[in-house]
């Protein structure tokens, strides 16, 4: 029996090193085995990158992180060029090791107590009117990081009273009641928690997570804050069927969720879970029609859609795909 790897606190484990720590193994895929990307998955980079560099500089200056960079989001150039970013709090090292995700795994450092103030000042300096705040999973913290979320929301509103805040939260595993109690007095304007995929594939896609637990988190927040929209996101291309995705959409509606994002999974490296299929824009359009028919008020469905992709437009009910 091999000895468990002793992780050094503050060290990022990525790609092969990260995947080696996952109990449910995935086999690295060679380049010639990868599915060829269809034409609709080709990304056009903006000609002017000055806005992109400006946002990165502001992040570095204040020691902040964006999930756009840490998770290698394909929309980074487009979003940064439009002056929007999704801030990732509680560090850049996740205590989980999901094999679809490019965020580093390891033993994170203690939360930066100055981060709420630095984040609020950066957002005020950027003049943002809508901001998305997410985080790594922090299973090492007794509240799962909920107090840090609440502190960030409070600090942001103190400096930018007119801003709308969307939070994309982890599942607060084993700490749901405590987390919701902490967030009660400083709730966001949109509460987002991603189911990611179907229950049949959860052990492979989200080791350490629980499908029913995530649904319950969304439901309990909605019960406590009926006036605040709840939102969830799913990826396709991991081995599920369109019908299984539609069943998950029904589960979300049954738990009070009114906003949906649905996008194509892209493999961050050959060590991550491989793409099993590419879903066509026409299929995304069909699933959007299904979502609206079952009562979602907002449904952003398309190959490049991510939870926070044009989140301000999503919240306004505008077309995003």
Swiss-Prot record:
Its cofactor is [4Fe-4S] cluster. InterPro entries: Aldolase_TIM (IPR013785), Elp3/MiaA/NifB-like_rSAM (IPR006638), LIAS_N (IPR031691), Lipoyl_synth (IPR003698), rSAM (IPR007197). It is an enzyme of class 2 (transferase). The keyword 4Fe-4S applies. This is Lipoyl synthase. Binds 2 [4Fe-4S] clusters per subunit. One cluster is coordinated with 3 cysteines and an exchangeable S-adenosyl-L-methionine. GO terms for molecular function: 4 iron, 4 sulfur cluster binding; lipoate synthase activity; metal ion binding. Transmembrane segments: none annotated. It comes from Edwardsiella ictaluri (strain 93-146). Its EC number is 2.8.1.8.
């Amino acid at each position: 029996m091999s000895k468990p790897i002793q992780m050094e606190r503050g060290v990022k484990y990525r790609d092969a090193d990260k995947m080696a720590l996952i109990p449910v193994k995935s086999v690295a895929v060679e380049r010639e085995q990868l599915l060829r990307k269809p034409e609709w998955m080709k990304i056009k980079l903006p000609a002017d990158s000055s806005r992109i560099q400006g946002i990165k500089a502001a992040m570095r200056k204040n020691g902040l992180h964006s999930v756009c960079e840490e998770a290698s989001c394909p929309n980074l150039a487009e979003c940064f060029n439009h002056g929007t970013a999704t801030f990732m709090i509680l560090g850049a090292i996740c205590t989980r090791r999901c094999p679809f995700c490019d965020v580093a795994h390891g033993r994170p450092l203690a939360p930066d107590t100055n981060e709420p103030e630095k984040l609020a000042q950066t957002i005020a300096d950027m003049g943002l009117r809508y901001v998305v705040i997410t985080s790594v999973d922090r299973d090492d913290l007794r509240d799962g990081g909920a107090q840090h979320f609440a502190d960030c929301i409070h600090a942001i509103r103190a400096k930018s009273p007119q801003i709308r805040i969307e939070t994309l939260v982890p599942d607060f595993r084993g700490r749901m009641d405590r987390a919701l109690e902490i967030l009660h007095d400083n709730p966001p304007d949109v509460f987002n928690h991603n189911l990611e995929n179907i229950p049949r594939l959860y052990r492979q896609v989200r080791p350490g997570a629980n499908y029913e637990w995530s649904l319950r988190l969304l439901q309990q927040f909605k019960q406590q804050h009926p006036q605040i929209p709840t939102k969830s996101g799913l990826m396709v291309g991991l081995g599920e069927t369109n019908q299984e995705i539609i069943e998950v959409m029904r589960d979300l509606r049954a738990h009070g969720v009114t906003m949906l994002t649905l996008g194509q999974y892209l493999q961050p490296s050959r060590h991550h879970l491989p793409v099993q299929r590419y879903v066509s824009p026409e299929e995304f359009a069909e699933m959007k029609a299904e979502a609206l028919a079952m009562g979602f008020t907002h449904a952003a469905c398309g190959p490049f859609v991510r939870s926070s992709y044009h989140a301000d437009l999503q919240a306004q009910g505008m077309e995003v795909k």
